[in-house]
Amino acid sequence: MIGLVGKKAGMTRIFTEDGVSIPVTVIEVEANRVTQVKDLANDGYRAIQVTTGAKKANRVTKPEAGHFAKAGVEAGRGLWEFRLAEGEEFTVGQSISVELFAEVKKVDVTGTSKGKGFAGTVKRWNFRTQDATHGNSLSHRVPGSIGQNQTPGKVFKGKKMAGQMGNERVTVQSLDVVRVDAERNLLLVKGAVPGATGSDLIVKPAVKA
């Protein structure tokens, strides 16, 4: 089953009939418009390309304008692709709404995490700090040794060190679908999802459901 592209609207909470508070993320899922259908004969695999939202005319490049015009859809804020399962069929120009998730219980949500800038090992990797006193005057938050000796004579790839933290693609799996509001194009999922308010999210049925 394909997924949908939405926008993170923020977090709130809703109450069950028993008065239990459930923290939810509100995802605004405007209609996804199919801009291209890929098939085995021409592309080597089956997939659909979709867009959503709107883009100012002066922000649309000529190649984008031609692509959207060929599909007969309004220019959106980006292009995303979803692989098609056996038996799934879509047509160019078709509109897909949040009702796609009406019967789905759990979803996987992918987004770009908030960027934290250049961070040290304590913040980035949860390293322990060294002694605050007892003769330690310079090495409170340093990582310590990062290698061995002349052999191997290098720092191994993947070594946890200071650097850019956040601003990377993150997927949170198996979030409960609390409510699907087709009238307002809203999807409410339990818990937090990656990214800042207003950022784009890819929502798919959970692979581990």
UniProtKB/Swiss-Prot annotation:
Record key words, sorted: Methylation, Ribonucleoprotein, Ribosomal protein, RNA-binding, rRNA-binding
Region annotated Disordered, chain positions: 133-152
Nucleotide-binding keyword on record: no
Post-translational modification N5-methylglutamine, affected residues: 150
Record keyword Disulfide bond present: no
GO biological process terms on file: translation
InterPro entries documented for this protein: Ribosomal_uL3, Ribosomal_uL3_bac/org-type, Ribosomal_uL3_CS, Transl_B-barrel_sf
Gene Ontology MF term list: rRNA binding; structural constituent of ribosome
Changes after translation: Methylated by PrmB.
Protein function: One of the primary rRNA binding proteins, it binds directly near the 3'-end of the 23S rRNA, where it nucleates assembly of the 50S subunit.
Family (UniProt): Belongs to the universal ribosomal protein uL3 family.
HAMAP family given in the database record: Ribosomal_uL3_B (MF_01325_B)
Subunit-level organization: Part of the 50S ribosomal subunit. Forms a cluster with proteins L14 and L19.
Protein name as it appears in the record: Large ribosomal subunit protein uL3
Species of origin: Shigella sonnei (strain Ss046)
